A protein has these predicted regions:
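N-terminal signal peptide
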Residues: 4-24
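LRR N-terminal entry segment and analogous cap-like coil->beta motifs
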Residues: 29-67, 73-76, 421-428
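Leucine-rich repeat
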Residues: 30, 50-52, 72-77, 96-101, ...
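Consensus "Asn ladder" position of solenoid repeat domains
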Residues: 39, 60, 81-84, 105-108, ...
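Recurring C-terminal helix/loop segment of individual leucine-rich repeat
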Residues: 43-47, 65-71, 89-95, 116-122, ...
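Leucine-rich repeat domain C-terminal region
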Residues: 108-118, 211, 222, 232-233, ...
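Solenoidal tandem-repeat scaffolds enriched in leucines and small polar residues
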Residues: 111-300, 311, 320-322, 348
Length: 584
């Protein structure tokens, strides 16, 4: 016992000296950059040394940035304190960061001491990038925080509790170029709220509660996101100055009509998906269809000129609306259109309107070819109710390379081919019986075609002759019968083929020798043997999952020994006694 008492002072001295010794920081550090992300810090690390310019302190438990002497941080330019528990920032601390350019404070509690914090922010004279997202800030709080940041260029106020943008909220930030206000509760933007922001180029107002945008006057904007609001009306200001807007996202709103953008000559990307647009034809406007009443409806005038100024639009998304017709005249005014989506609408017929708004039979040309030819290269029409595409349809799309017609009810027509290259003689087109099938032959520029889930039960001979397809999707057509001649004409072009989920047995899946086929999906069928036509194809990827295969023919594997890179075989009743092919 005496010995233990004699040793106790020595033990205590050793312990105290160990506690006094500074602990090594669990941070990644270089001369100018330090990252202490997610290391459990509860206070600002003062002992990081001189010359640090980049400091990352996100995902910690720091509550205060106040009353601290910060030696060595006079050179700091970038500070990230997102995802902490920060609620207090003092002027004393910020005064020691004269070179700070970027301050990221997202996902903290800056609503709690906003007035004192906002006063401290007045010392951030050189700040250019500020993130105040997800801090439970109301409109007046956000305005107070930025009330003296005259050099600010990028501001993130997303995921807060702002309900309005009052006049003057941005008067002190005239150099602002990018502004994120998404995921708030903004219902009102007072006239003149953005008036001071003459350099503003990018605005994100997605996921708010806006009902109407009228007199839109931000002519200098390049990118505007208004998706996921409750907009029924979007009307730009009728001024002489053109808009510089290039990207406009109005998706997931309640728009009843195509927005009026007469001066948006530089617009290249327009997203109108997930709205309530039922027609693109002139004269379809009826004010009573609006849920709310707007004084702007009196001058809302729908004509063919609605899209006349959109000469640079290359990408237009109208998917998931209520369109019933495909109006060629409307899209013709979009002279630069490359990608068009009308997926998930109510299309049953391709619009048969003439230039005089009359209706003509679908098997006749609806108007002179030069008045309606589209420049579209990619067209998405999946998930509609289209039964037939008239024979002139592809003539009006001479640049078309990709078309998705999945989940419709189209039946390809037969075309008679003579040679392996797919040449058609004059008059060889087989007429569509009663206009019930769609001619996919002789479309020379078409490269990618999807006809999945079209209830196709029989593929006619030479259905794609003189159409040099690179990829063809025929999946989801249960019970499909495909004779050997069905893909005649594709021997020298087809590289990717999907016959997935067709429940085809051996007698229904005959393939010609496809000299360029690299990717083949035969999964979800009832095959016990592979089609022999495949053996001459230079396959790189083969999917035969969920069939009735007992083995893979050795002849096929030998043929593919130098090309095959991956094969999927799960879900087949392979015999364990005949797996020698695995060694091939």
């Amino acid at each position: 016992g005496c010995l233990l008492l004699w040793l106790l002072p020595s033990v205590l001295r050793a312990q105290s000296s160990e506690e006094a010794r500074p602990r090594s920081m669990p941070c990644q550090q270089s001369p100018a950059k330090v990252s202490c992300k997610g290391v459990g810090l509860r206070k600002f690390p003062k002992e990081l040394g001189q010359g640090v310019k980049y400091l990352e302190l996100s995902n910690n438990f720091i509550q205060n940035l106040s009353g601290s002497y910060l030696p060595g941080f006079g050179q700091l330019e970038y500070l990230d304190m997102c995802f902490n528990q920060l609620e207090a920032v003092s002027a004393t601390t910020l005064a020691q960061l004269p070179r700070l350019r970027s301050l990221l404070l997202g996902s903290n509690h800056l609503d709690r001491n906003y007035y004192a914090n906002g006063q401290a922010f007045r010392l951030l004279r050189n700040i250019e990038v500020l993130d105040l997202s997800a801090n439970n800030l109301e409109s007046h709080m956000a305005g107070w925080y930025i009330s003296n940041l005259t050099r600010l260029r990028v501001l993130d106020l997303s995921r807060n509790k702002m309900t309005r943008l009052p006049v003057g909220i941005f008067w002190s930030t005239p150099r602002l170029r990018e502004l994120d206000l998404s995921n708030n509760y903004i219902m009102e933007i007072e006239e003149g709220a953005f008036e001071a922001l003459e350099l503003l180029e990018v605005v994100n107002l997605a996921l708010n509660s806006l009902h109407c945008i009228s007199g839109f006057s931000l002519t200098q904007l390049r990118v505007l996101n208004l998706s996921h609001n409750a907009l029924e009306l979007f009307v730009s200001e009728e001024g002489a100055e053109p808009y510089l807007l290039q990207v406009l996202d109005l998706s997931h709103n309640r728009l009843l009509y195509f927005p009026e953008l007469p001066k948006a000559h530089y617009l290249t990307h327009l997203n109108l998906s997930n709205n309530l647009i039922a027609s693109l034809l002139p004269g379809s406007h009826h004010p009573g269809e609006f849920v709310l009443r707007y004084t702007e409806m009196a001058r809302f005038n729908r004509t063919l000129h609605t899209a006349a100024g959109l000469t640079h639009v290359a990408d237009l998304d109208l998917s998931n609306n209520r369109l019933q017709l495909f109006p060629f005249t409307f899209f013709h005014s979009l002279g630069s259109l490359q990608s068009l989506s009308l997926a998930m609408n109510c299309l049953q017929d391709i619009a048969r309107e003439s230039l005089t708004d009359g209706m003509e039979p679908s098997d006749h040309l609806p108007m002179p070819l030069e008045h309606a030819t589209l420049s579209v290269r990619s067209l998405d029409l999946h998930s509609n109710a289209i039964h037939v595409l008239p024979r002139w349809f592809f003539d009006y799309l001479p640049q078309l390379e990709t078309i998705d017609l999945g989940s419709n009810s189209l039946q390809p027509c037969e075309s008679q081919g003579s040679d392996r290259g797919g040449n058609l003689g004059e008059g060889s087109h087989v007429p569509a019986p009663g206009g019930t099938c769609t001619p996919f032959y002789n479309v020379p520029r078409l490269k990618h075609l999807s006809l999945c889930k079209n209830n196709i039960t029989r593929l006619q001979p030479y259905a794609f002759n003189q159409t040099s397809l690179l990829s063809l999707d025929l999946s989801g057509n249960k019970g499909l019968f495909m004779p050997k001649e069905a893909l005649g004409g594709l021997e020298l072009s087809l590289q990717k083929l999907s016959l997935r989920g067709n429940q085809m047995d051996n007698s229904k899946a005959e393939l010609p020798c496809l000299d360029t086929l690299k990717v083949l999906d035969l999964s979800g069928n009832n095959l016990s043997l592979l089609p022999t036509g495949l053996f001459c194809s230079p396959l790189e990827s083969l999917d035969v999952r969920n069939n009735n295969l007992l083995t893979l023919e050795k002849l096929a594997l030998v043929s593919w020994s130098h090309s095959l890179k991956d094969v999927s075989i799960a879900g087949n009743p392979f015999s364990c006694c005949s797996l020698a092919w695995l060694d091939t």
